[in-house]
């Protein structure tokens, strides 16, 4: 499990090297601004920001009831669904959100969207982000290890679920001036929403479908943003 921490830090560290080795002062300034400027976060987006994930969990539990799911899923979970053995799980969830988004939204996604529409960049990024988690199925006691040993299909669902989640985080980030803070906070909300209630893996499969519907709705609602080409080529690396 000690190998998890360097793995979590890798996106951030690689991004720091790429950014600060660059001779582009604007790139460095933009990174610092998106990391520190809380005013980039739009108050009007906050209800969506805080409610998408908790509501997706609640809706998924209600749907699961029609397929034999239990009302006990509305109870608070007695503990986390995995263990680390070296740092508290809550701290790990926060570190995961922080280090991942510092790298992913701080540099990687920004680099992709300079070459592609937001839609295409989001799809590419989400698939790559999903695959990035794959080695964790071999890390004893990790969440991915636990669910893959419970059921191959539950493990597969985890990787599929990351794709609509990545699209949603991209939308949240873009709508808030590409704020890295917004991405970190939303990512942490995602992590906590999966742990706070006693939901089953079957319900999490249902949640993947719910998140896919939410993603399609966001794309339809903000089609102009997702498919705009106005921003292409504006960021040099």
Predicted regions and their residues:
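Hydrophobic/aromatic residues in alpha-helical transmembrane segments
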Residues: 59, 108, 165-169
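Histidine-centered divalent metal-coordination motifs
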Residues: 101, 133, 187, 191
